[in-house]
């Protein structure tokens, strides 16, 4: 049961094949067995079991709340959860218990979902590896997969040491690891520059970033208000659509949410015709740093659409080379503004220094924030200085408009969906990842993803195939603003063609027997 999709488990619950309590207990048991992954900061065992008990009563009375009733989910620890600690993986908020739920959390609970816990991340979601939080780095479940370990045994240069584990990507790495290791069926991440799609690609998952304004940000502790979006991590596209159907819609507590009618639920056709589609391939994304394996799979994915009658067209996004610098200026500027609220006076960490308010304020922030967060605050304050404001922040805003217009022009040229890489390569070992600083790594890892956030578009990363090392590689689809359903429909068709294989966790074979029974093989269409 643990290896099935959300949709399959929902059907099993409705048919009485398993109860919510039994399912919850299985997931809690697996969370304990996979504690070494460090995916969870807080495990809400009592809360989840109580929710499972209530769900069980509803099923017995024939009053199921829908597809999410009784389904174990996890939430990134930068979403407020009433009565459950919310830390952002920072000393600044360690011990902070919010008095309210984020809108997306409340919507999941209103649909009967079971909250298994809060997942690990980079401090305040600032990073691309899930390595810079106070609770330690998250380990990629694929580090312990049969596929990866067998490939390592074949490599004469491999040391095959347990210390050579892989990063999950970030900053939603805990959520990605939680879903990948079968401890829940869906998880919330946040996506400011790729923080949901990046770990999805590294962990063999579907990572969906909705259009800006489609899903409420209320209760998501802000990083960059103009780009932050709640993200969804699942094992298949249909599951992401189910969760999106529960989350999408206007929220009076978030003025950026759209109030136009939205087609809900997001039902995806079982058979889609892609022959009339035009798939755009941005030529600026073909960069030297892109690994040969990702480049090859990207090309074969385009050929796959073409073989089905779709038109594949090379397009230009001419301001792409400026996007990562533009993103850095705007991101750090908004970070500096948002982090100003953590002053030790209202909530969160407070230093004991009583010399003056200014001294207490400075010491609190020095103790509460790590070097990465303090560095971004300093950069942002520099860009916002009176003498720098026009040359940096205002110019970056103008470039952002040009970047957004590039996408508009591409779609207006007849393109329906853009196809790009998600990451430069597969996941790398932790010891290799930390050789470079957070800022450098983030700039590299966000190269294909952050422009989508600046343009407010929907995007989804789909696992395509395993690399020669036995690790997941993902590709990204980008859609028009608020054409999320069309985007997911195309992604579902592609997912069916490539048939990405399930992870085989050697330590968890007994628990994941369903995975082995239903194991799929990598598609020959992209690997041959």
Swiss-Prot record:
Any one GO biological process: mitochondrial translation
* Gene Ontology molecular function: any one: ATP binding
Annotated Gene Ontology cellular components are: glutamyl-tRNA(Gln) amidotransferase complex; mitochondrion
| Signal peptide start-end | none
Q: Where is this region: Disordered?
A: 147-166
- ATP-binding as a keyword of this entry, yes or no, is yes
Chief location: mitochondrion
Record's keyword terms, sorted: ATP-binding, Ligase, Mitochondrion, Nucleotide-binding, Protein biosynthesis
| InterPro entries to which the protein is assigned, alphabetical | Amidase, Amidase_dom, AS_sf, GatA
**Which positions are catalytic residues?**
76 (charge relay system), 171 (charge relay system), 195 (acyl-ester intermediate)
Tell me the compartments it is located in: Mitochondrion
Q: Which PANTHER family match?
A: GLUTAMYL-TRNA(GLN) AMIDOTRANSFERASE SUBUNIT A, MITOCHONDRIAL, TRANSAMIDASE
The protein's name in its UniProt record: Glutamyl-tRNA(Gln) amidotransferase subunit A, mitochondrial
Name of the coding gene? QRSL1
């Amino acid at each position: 049961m643990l290896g099935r999709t959300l949709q399959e488990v929902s059907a099993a619950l409705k048919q009485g094949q398993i109860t919510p309590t039994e399912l919850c207990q299985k997931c809690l048991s697996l969370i304990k067995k996979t504690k070494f992954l460090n995916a969870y900061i807080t495990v809400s065992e009592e809360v989840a079991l109580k929710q499972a008990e209530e769900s069980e009563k509803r099923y017995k009375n024939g009053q199921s709340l829908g597809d999410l009733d009784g389904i174990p989910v996890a939430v990134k620890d930068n979403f407020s959860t009433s009565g459950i600690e919310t830390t952002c993986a920072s000393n600044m908020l360690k011990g902070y218990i919010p008095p309210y739920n984020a809108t997306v959390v409340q919507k999941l609970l209103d649909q009967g979902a079971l909250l298994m816990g809060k997942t690990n991340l980079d401090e305040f979601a600032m990073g691309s590896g899930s390595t810079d939080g106070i609770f330690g780095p998250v380990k990629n479940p694929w580090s312990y997969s049969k596929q990866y370990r067998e490939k390592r045994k074949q490599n004469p240069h491999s040391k095959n040491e347990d210390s050579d584990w892989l990063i999950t990507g970030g900053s939603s790495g805990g959520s990605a690891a939680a879903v990948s290791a079968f401890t829940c069926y869906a998880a919330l991440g946040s996506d400011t520059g790729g923080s949901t799609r990046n770990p999805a690609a590294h962990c063999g998952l579907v990572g969906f970033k909705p259009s800006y304004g489609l899903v409420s940000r209320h209760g998501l502790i802000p990083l960059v208000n103009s780009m932050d979006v709640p993200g969804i991590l699942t094992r298949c596209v249909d599951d992401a659509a189910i969760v999106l159907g529960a989350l999408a819609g206007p929220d009076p507590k978030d003025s950026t949410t759209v109030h136009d009618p939205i087609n809900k639920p997001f039902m995806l056709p079982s058979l889609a015709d892609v022959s009339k589609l035009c798939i755009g391939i941005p030529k600026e994304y073909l960069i030297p740093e892109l690994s040969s394996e990702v480049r090859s799979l990207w090309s074969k994915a385009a050929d796959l659409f073409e073989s089905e009658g779709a038109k594949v067209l090379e397009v230009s996004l001419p301001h792409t080379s400026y996007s990562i610098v533009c993103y850095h200026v705007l991101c750090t500027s908004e970070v500096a503004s948002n982090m100003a609220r953590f002053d030790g006076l209202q909530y969160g960490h407070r230093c004991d220094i009583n010399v003056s308010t200014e001294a207490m304020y400075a010491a609190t922030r020095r103790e509460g924030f790590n070097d990465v967060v303090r560095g971004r605050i300093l950069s942002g304050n520099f860009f916002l200085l009176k003498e720098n404001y026009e040359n940096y922040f205002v110019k970056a805003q103008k470039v952002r408009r040009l970047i957004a217009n590039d996408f508009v022009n591409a779609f207006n040229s007849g393109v329906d969906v853009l196809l790009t890489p998600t990451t430069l390569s597969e996941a790398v070992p932790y010891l290799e990842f930390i050789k470079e600083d957070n800022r450098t790594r983030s700039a590299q890892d966000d190269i294909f993803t952050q422009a989508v956030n600046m343009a407010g578009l929907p995007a989804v990363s789909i696992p395509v195939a395993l690399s020669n090392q036995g690790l997941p590689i993902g590709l990204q689809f980008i859609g028009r603003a608020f054409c999320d359903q069309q985007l997911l429909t195309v992604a579902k068709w592609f997912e069916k063609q490539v048939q990405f294989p399930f992870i085989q966790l050697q330590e968890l074979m007994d628990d994941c027997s369903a995975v082995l029974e239903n194991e799929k093989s990598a598609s020959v269409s992209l690997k041959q």
